[in-house]
Every structure is written in structure tokens, then in C-alpha cells.
UniProtKB/Swiss-Prot annotation:
GO terms for biological process: 'de novo' pyrimidine nucleobase biosynthetic process; formaldehyde assimilation via ribulose monophosphate cycle; L-ascorbic acid catabolic process; one-carbon metabolic process. Its EC number is 4.1.2.43. This is 3-hexulose-6-phosphate synthase. It comes from Methylomonas aminofaciens. It is an enzyme of class 4 (lyase). Pfam families: OMPdecase (PF00215). The lineage of its organism: Bacteria, Pseudomonadati, Pseudomonadota, Gammaproteobacteria, Methylococcales. The keyword Cell membrane does not apply. Keywords: Carbohydrate metabolism, Lyase, One-carbon metabolism.
Length: 209
């Protein structure tokens, strides 16, 4: 069984809240995407936290420096998970992990553009990372890349960490990523691009369970 996560990627504050209202009953985790949080700020997190107390909320900060300093306000405001880039300095990554631990929350290390994903996963596991994010970005997807080979690499390490997979996941690939060991399955366009986002979210969650 895997958890499902919906990526909220719109820059429009009200549209983001409206979409969250449709999909929140059908997913486990609401993700505030990087452009979305940069554009709308911590107020959006506070709004979603108040409206959706039963969902986990991930804020995709993609922290690259000043780990503890950047992440702490978001944990304090109600984030359950924030992200830090795997290409960041280990001290930065440790700072985000420390901030998460201070609030009883989780830090996700995003492996986007990490060269040796197995080696970095082992390093951050030693630091106490909670979740590894296997992430094929939008620009990489446009070039035809997928996260599936990298997912197999990371889950094959058997480090006991949660593993999130993002990048072009749709109903037809949910079984594949679940069988490959993903514990969190992230869908964005497959939900928000659907004619009925609530139904699309429910379908993906049904396949993930």
C-alpha cells in the first residue's frame, strides 16, 4: 500500500485552494509545488492547513542553502514535510532534517539532478533523512525521461526509508511504481489536467492501496 500525493502547481492562490477542496478527500498528502509556494508564500500553507486538518501537507521548498533557517517557519506553520535538494551541501540537508525533527515532522531529500543517486541516498540516510524523493522534473519529462529506473536503484538499497516517486505518474503506471517499492506516489497533471480532478484522484488512490 502506498500513500498518494497531489501536486498543486498553479500560481493562482484561489484556484489552488479550490482544486485542493476537490481532491483533498481523495488523497493522503497535498503538495504545494515549488512555483506555487514561491508565488503565494507561507499564507497559502496556513490557509490549506486550516482547511484540511486531515491531510498531510508537503511544501516543496527545494532548499539549497540555509536549511534549518528556511525550513523551520514552514514546519511551524503546519507543514508535515518539506523538501531539500540532494545536490545541496550535507550541512544544508542536515539542517532541514534537524528542523523536521524539532517539530516531529519529516524531511524529504529530492534526488533531482543528483549524479550518483545510490551514493547520495546512503549519505543522507546516515544523516537521518525520512523520505527520499525520486523526481523527474517537468523539463526532464519534456525530454522523455521517467523516474522508473532511478526508483529501482533507490528502493534496491533497502535502507528502510520512505520513497516518494514523482514525474509523469498516471493511472497506467501506478501499479508499476508501487511494485517497485514506492511508498508515496505523486500525481500532478494526471489529476489537475483531468476533466474531473476528484475522480482522477480517487482512481489513482484506489490503485495505490
Amino acid at each position: 500500500m502506498a500513500l498518494t500525493q497531489m501536486a498543486l502547481d498553479s500560481l493562482d492562490f484561489d484556484a489552488t485552494v479550490a482544486l485542493a477542496e476537490k481532491v483533498a478527500p481523495h488523497v493522503d498528502i497535498l503538495e504545494i509545488g515549488t512555483p506555487c509556494i514561491k508565488h503565494n508564500g507561507i499564507k497559502l500553507l496556513e490557509t490549506l492547513r486550516a482547511k484540511f486538518p486531515n491531510n498531510k501537507i508537503l511544501v516543496d521548498l527545494k532548499t539549497m542553502d540555509a536549511g534549518f533557517y528556511e525550513a523551520e517557519p514552514f514546519y511551524k506553520a503546519g507543514a508535515d514535510i518539506t523538501t531539500v535538494l540532494g545536490v545541496a551541501d550535507l550541512g544544508t540537508i542536515k539542517g532541514v532534517i534537524d528542523a523536521a525533527n524539532k517539530y516531529g515532522k519529516k524531511a524529504q531529500i529530492d534526488l533531482i539532478n543528483v549524479g550518483d543517486k545510490a551514493a547520495r541516498t546512503k549519505e543522507v540516510a546516515k544523516l537521518g533523512a525520512h523520505i527520499i524523493g525520486v523526481h523527474t522534473g517537468l523539463d526532464q519529462q519534456a525530454a522523455g525521461q521517467t523516474p522508473f529506473a532511478d526508483l529501482a536503484t533507490v528502493t534496491g538499497l533497502n535502507l528502510g526509508l520512505e520513497v516518494s516517486v514523482a514525474g509523469g505518474v498516471k493511472p497506467a503506471t501506478v501499479a508499476q511504481v508501487k511494485d517497485a517499492g514506492a511508498t508515496i506516489i505523486v500525481a500532478g497533471a494526471a489529476i489537475y489536467g483531468a476533466a474531473d480532478p476528484a475522480a482522477a484522484a480517487a482512481e489513482i488512490t484506489g490503485l495505490a492501496k
